Amino acid sequence: MKTVKVTTDNKISIIDVDFDDFRSIQCAIGGHFETVHTQLMADYFKDPSVIMLVDEEGLIKELPLNPVGSALYRSVIAGDLIFAQVRGDDIVAPDDAEDLKDRLLHTFIGLQEA
């Protein structure tokens, strides 16, 4: 399933992630993950189901700051992240990964395609 990944060095890309396999998510992020959602994200994406999956131990591991994630969370996000959506009890790929990527590229100065 296609999703958007944003790295700490401001690179954005479309990647394949099997959201039915937590190991696939861990591989994409680089460790154990947690979900992050804010009202700012819901407003920005015009969709309350959009979430970020971030490295749960990013700060403990002293990973670099993720500027995009930190801006959307309004607090420090350390490490790479991917976007997803919540559907009931499931975490699934975004409806339109390309549109999500384009929206982020137009908003965040310095963000570049990988």
Features from the language model and the residues they span:
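Domain-length accessory/inserted modules outside core catalytic folds
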Residues: 1-114
